[in-house]
């Protein structure tokens, strides 16, 4: 795509060297649009799917009035939020009040720059893709803290403190789990990590994916991922029964929609990261001898992401909310020790004769 745009502007339109630069910029913008528009539409219908799934689990119907089978409900929700007035507390910090939602949303968008959907569908294929993801997603907590403090509300500030402490705590456990994947893959490049899952003793099958040999750390990662996204049962940052709605209690209209969008984009990002790191990415679960069914493709990547997102919804509908002290105890006294212990165990395993990743 980049070469096509550069040829278009440099040769066809006669812009010369300037055309090469313009073509590069235009190709990047087009790639960003190709990622962002499906991503926003996915968020819209993820909310619809969530309400339908939870309604089914609770023996309800869910959205079924706006459009056929309620399919236009996400757009109705968007228009409702867009046309609502954005109000703010009189004593709040105006600049920081509006910067908070933007700082929460921007990292969740920027992280998609390095997420591949197959060997070719990636905006930027860098060797430190995993490190980039961990770095960029950790910035979103600043938006939460700023929003909670700038609102000048005790409920907002308490929710922001809870969210930031929880996010920082579970980032440690999640990072420990991802370190284990890097150890067995020998790379932080997502394409290399996926390729490594097709090798080893059980290479070419679903049993060679990282979820099986790293199963204990896979469970640690899944729990940490739910806590990182502040989803039920770890949604104490916005515990309605305790602190009304957490750090975005004072937000309305489009400003609230930005927080909402950031949360769901982060959910989809975690689903993509889970697929790449533990579930073989775009690798097929079937042997390649099965023809097109066994061929690696972006379809399998999307299917695995959908399965992880369904797991998110199932967890929300099944488990009650934990108390804040229980969440912090689980993170610091259970998941983090298990994560660090497994790093040591995995190191010994890899230098032993029982190494599965040779």
UniProtKB/Swiss-Prot annotation:
It is found in: Cell inner membrane. GO terms for molecular function: oxidoreductase activity, acting on NAD(P)H, quinone or similar compound as acceptor; quinone binding. GO terms for cellular component: plasma membrane; respiratory chain complex I. It is a multi-pass membrane protein. Its EC number is 7.1.1.-. It comes from the Bacteria. InterPro entries: NADH_UbQ_OxRdtase_su1/FPO, NADH_UbQ_OxRdtase_su1_CS. Signal peptide: none annotated. The chain crosses the membrane at residues 20-40, 95-115, 128-148, 168-188, 206-226, 253-273, 295-315, 334-354. GO terms for biological process: aerobic respiration. Keywords: Cell inner membrane, Cell membrane, Membrane, NAD, Quinone, Translocase, Transmembrane, Transmembrane helix, Ubiquinone. PROSITE patterns: COMPLEX1_ND1_2. It holds the Pfam family NADHdh. It catalyses: a quinone + NADH + 5 H(+)(in) = a quinol + NAD(+) + 4 H(+)(out). NDH-1 shuttles electrons from NADH, via FMN and iron-sulfur (Fe-S) centers, to quinones in the respiratory chain. The immediate electron acceptor for the enzyme in this species is believed to be ubiquinone. Couples the redox reaction to proton translocation (for every two electrons transferred, four hydrogen ions are translocated across the cytoplasmic membrane), and thus conserves the redox energy in a proton gradient. This subunit may bind ubiquinone. Belongs to the complex I subunit 1 family. NDH-1 is composed of 14 different subunits. Subunits NuoA, H, J, K, L, M, N constitute the membrane sector of the complex. This is NADH-quinone oxidoreductase subunit H. It comes from Neisseria meningitidis serogroup B (strain ATCC BAA-335 / MC58). The lineage of its organism: Bacteria, Pseudomonadati, Pseudomonadota, Betaproteobacteria, Neisseriales.
């Amino acid at each position: 795509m980049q070469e096509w745009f550069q040829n278009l502007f440099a040769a066809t339109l006669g812009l010369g060297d300037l055309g090469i630069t313009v073509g590069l910029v235009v190709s990047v913008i087009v790639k960003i649009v190709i990622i962002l528009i499906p991503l926003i539409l996915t968020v819209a219908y993820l909310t619809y799917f969530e309400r339908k799934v939870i309604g089914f689990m609770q023996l309800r119907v869910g959205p079924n009035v706006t459009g056929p089978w309620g399919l236009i409900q996400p757009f109705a929700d968007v228009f409702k939020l867009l046309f609502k007035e954005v109000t703010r507390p009189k004593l709040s910090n105006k600049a920081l009040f509006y910067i908070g939602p933007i700082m929460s949303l921007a990292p969740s968008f920027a992280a998609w720059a390095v997420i591949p959907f197959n060997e070719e569908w990636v905006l930027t294929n860098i060797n430190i893709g995993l490190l980039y993801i961990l770095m960029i997603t950790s910035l979103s907590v600043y938006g939460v803290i700023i929003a909670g403090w700038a609102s000048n509300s005790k409920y907002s500030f308490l929710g922001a403190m809870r969210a930031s402490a929880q996010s920082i705590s579970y980032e440690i456990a999640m990072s420990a789990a991802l370190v284990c994947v890097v150890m067995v893959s020998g790379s932080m490049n997502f394409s290399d990590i996926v390729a490594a899952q097709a090798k080893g003793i059980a290479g070419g099958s679903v049993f060679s994916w990282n979820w099986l040999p790293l199963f204990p750390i896979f469970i640690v990662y899944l729990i940490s991922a739910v806590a990182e996204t502040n989803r039920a049962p770890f949604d104490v940052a916005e515990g309605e029964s305790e602190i009304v709605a957490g750090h975005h209690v004072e937000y309305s209209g489009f400003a609230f929609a930005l927080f909402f969008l950031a949360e769901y984009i982060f959910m989809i990002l975690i689903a993509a990261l889970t697929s790449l790191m533990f579930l073989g990415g775009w690798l097929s679960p079937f042997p390649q001898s099965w023809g097109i069914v066994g061929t690696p493709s972006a379809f399998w990547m999307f299917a695995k992401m959908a399965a992880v997102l369904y797991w998110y919804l199932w967890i929300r509908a099944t488990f009650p909310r934990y108390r804040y002290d229980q969440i912090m105890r689980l993170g610091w006294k259970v998941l983090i020790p298990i994560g660090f212990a497994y790093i040591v165990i995995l190191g010994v395993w890899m230098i032993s004769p029982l190494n599965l990743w040779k």
